[in-house]
């Protein structure tokens, strides 16, 4: 398991379960046998949905579940009473408060068979499996645009071949990072060769000491392999960057600016002040409350964005800021003009064409929502300005890198490090690009699709 995914695995707490909870609503009932067949042919092609996690305290691994039982992951349930929206929200809230079984693959679905004459599917997936962008890819792999399409099994799409020269951890001895870096690598090798030769006699002694570790040897070997894997990925990025430097020397200047930007963002994250104190800032609890609004017409949101020269995301975030302001005012709270509510917003860092890969490849940026701004138009412009500043910086990349480092730390240290971040904000706000056309799951049209992320 990657270090970032390990961090999400270990962030689990009794008051903040690291689950993505989703609800799909269907106008017509879903046949459970057909759904089960579809999941077996289109969901289980992703190995992580057939694997459980083994965490030895140092590293975490995906292990095939030889006793996998679909019935343990797909449950049939019925709502009490009228079987309406309130009853469905209560059921989703109960499930959002319930841990997934860590002895099994970390996902579960509940098929609600009596919701408003149709059905609903409640899905819980641990965040260590994948992020929102990857899960949209999973959803698209499971669904069809034609309600009469057969439930034919599908394979996971593979990666496109890269044209960038790479090195790998299993490359021949003659091919290493120095040779892969060309002339720059030759200079580095010449500079460090004496030191490497001096260290060579220590290798045998180190191996002997390593062999004496007994039961600790295997987990340490695994940790080192994971670290080497991260090193190879970083090395590949360095090689790609070096290739661009040789083609365009101005790339080196841009890289220097980027490194300075990284340092600046790291310093900001370390000293980031808490946001304004409001009734929304508090400690998470074990009992969750789930709700949703009447769906918004996306066309109207786009029209507003077009007129104001803003993105859909800008309009939605500004609307949420206005709703929070209205809520606080309705409760009699004073909202100062300079009041800010920081929301952590995920930013996708997954390379284009890599959507098929599961795991987490996103960073977080701290957006300070201008809840003190009473003018809705001015609020949209201010959100646009702040989002543009965040997008031009490196906060998302730095935050993902920090999560990767945290993933290698002992659990106790992880909790302290992550606790510092959670104190800096009051909310998490996210949206992911959904399908542009109506989709059908097991022949039933998806009328509504909603999800909630960890807090």
Spell out what each predicted region is.
Residues 1-3, 12, 21-455:
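Soluble acyl-CoA-dependent acyltransferase catalytic core bearing the H(X)4D motif
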Residues 8-9:
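Basic/hydrophobic alpha-helical interface regions
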Residues 17-19:
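Short, surface-exposed loop/turn motifs at beta-strand boundaries within globular domains
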């Amino acid at each position: 398991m990657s270090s970032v995914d390990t961090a999400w695995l270990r962030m689990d707490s009794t008051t903040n379960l690291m689950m993505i909870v989703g609800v799909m609503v269907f106008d017509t009932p879903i046949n459970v046998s057909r759904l089960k067949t579809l999941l077996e042919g289109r969901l289980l092609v992703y190995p992580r949905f057939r694997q459980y996690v083994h965490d030895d305290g140092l590293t975490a691994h995906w292990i095939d579940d030889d006793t996998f039982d679909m019935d343990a992951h797909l449950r049939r349930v019925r709502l009490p009473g009228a079987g309406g929206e309130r009853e469905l929200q209560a059921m989703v809230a109960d499930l959002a408060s319930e841990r997934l079984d860590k002895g099994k693959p970390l996902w579960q679905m509940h098929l609600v068979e009596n919701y408003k004459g149709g059905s609903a599917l409640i899905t819980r997936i641990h965040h260590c499996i994948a992020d929102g962008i990857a899960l949209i890819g999973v959803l698209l792999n499971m669904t069809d645009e034609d309600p009469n399409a057969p439930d034919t099994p599908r394979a996971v799409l593979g990666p496109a071949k890269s044209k960038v020269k790479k090195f790998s951890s299993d490359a021949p001895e003659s091919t290493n990072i120095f040779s892969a870096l060309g002339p720059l690598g030759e200079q580095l090798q010449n500079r460090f060769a004496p030191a490497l030769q001096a260290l060579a006699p220590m290798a045998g002694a180190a191996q002997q000491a390593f062999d004496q570790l007994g039961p600790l040897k295997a987990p340490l070997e695994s940790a080192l392999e994971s670290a080497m894997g991260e090193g190879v990925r970083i090395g590949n990025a360095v090689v790609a960057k070096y290739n661009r430097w040789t083609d365009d020397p101005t790339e080196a200047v841009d890289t220097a600016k980027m490194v300075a930007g990284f340092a600046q963002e790291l310093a900001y994250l370390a000293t980031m002040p808490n946001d304004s104190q409001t009734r929304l800032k508090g400690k998470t609890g074990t009992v969750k409350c789930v709700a949703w609004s009447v769906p918004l017409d996306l066309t109207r949101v786009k029209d507003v964005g077009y007129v104001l020269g803003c993105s859909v995301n800008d309009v939605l975030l500004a609307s949420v800021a206005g709703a929070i302001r209205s809520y606080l005012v309705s409760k009699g709270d004073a909202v100062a003009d300079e009041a800010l509510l920081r929301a952590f917003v995920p930013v996708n860092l997954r390379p284009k064409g890599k959507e098929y890969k599961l795991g987490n490849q996103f960073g977080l940026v701290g957006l300070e929502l201008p809840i003190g701004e009473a003018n809705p138009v001015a609020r949209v412009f201010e959100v646009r300005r702040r989002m543009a500043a965040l997008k031009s910086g490196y906060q998302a990349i730095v935050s993902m890198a920090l999560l990767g480092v945290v993933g290698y730390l002992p659990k106790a240290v992880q909790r302290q490090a992550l606790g510092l971040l959670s104190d800096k904000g009051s909310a998490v706000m996210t949206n992911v690009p959904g399908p542009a056309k109506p989709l059908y799951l097991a022949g039933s049209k998806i009328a509504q699709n909603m999800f909630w992320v960890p807090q």
